[in-house]
Design a protein with these regions (language model features):
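A residue-level marker of the well-folded mature domains of exported/periplasmic proteins
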Residues: 1-193
Length: 193
């Protein structure tokens, strides 16, 4: 939105910021890219953006944490727990960082049982609670007994799975309190270190 651009401009013009971290997925294009053109002396780094060398301004870039390594471990836990051999993954969009997480989760599970399958349902956006619940319920109806996700509102997936009595692996932060019976483990961010 225009408010995002105004906030960045305020940080640059009033506070003297020379390095910007606009972290929300939707901030990358067009907002960060527009501001980078306006302020070529400021470096813009976007968490998870779809930055491409040679196509985006030289003062822009992107970064992302290696949470797919944690998703691999989630997959091992899921693969060791499933009775059906069917796992589920509720995801927002088919972009590289999400696909890395899906692949890592599946490879982790297959390291325990090569016959395991992972069904993926994309909701289309980062926070779609109704679609996330529908996707989880659809997977449960198909006999999937462990689910995980890559969405901004994992609480919905975790709570839906817990109510249905299946297992979950969390994402973003510790959600074990949401699913005391079915929470196996989770891929959690720790930006402090």
């Amino acid at each position: 939105t225009v408010a995002v651009e105004k906030s960045m401009e305020s940080m640059i013009n009033l506070d003297g910021a020379t390095l910007m971290f606009p972290t929300s997925f939707g901030y990358f294009d067009p907002h960060m890219l527009k501001e980078a053109v306006k302020f070529p002396a400021v470096q813009f780094s976007h968490c998870g953006g779809l930055w491409q060398e040679g196509e985006n301004p030289k003062n822009t870039g992107s970064y992302f944490g290696y949470i797919d390594e944690c998703q691999y471990l989630n997959g091992i836990a899921a693969g060791s727990t499933t009775k059906s051999g069917k796992l589920g993954f509720v995801a927002a969009k088919p972009i590289p960082q999400v696909l890395r997480n899906i692949n890592a989760f599946t490879l982790g599970a297959k390291s325990v049982n090569p016959k395991i399958t992972t069904q993926v349902i994309f909701t289309g956006d980062w926070a779609m609670p109704v679609k996330e619940a529908e996707a989880t319920n659809s997977m449960i109806a198909q006999g999937i007994d462990v689910v995980t996700c890559h969405v901004d509102s994992p609480k919905v997936v975790i709570e839906t799975a817990e109510r249905a009595g299946i297992f979950t692996c969390g994402y973003h932060c510790n959600q074990s309190k949401l699913a005391p019976k079915g929470y196996l483990t989770g891929a959690e961010w720790n930006w402090e270190k």
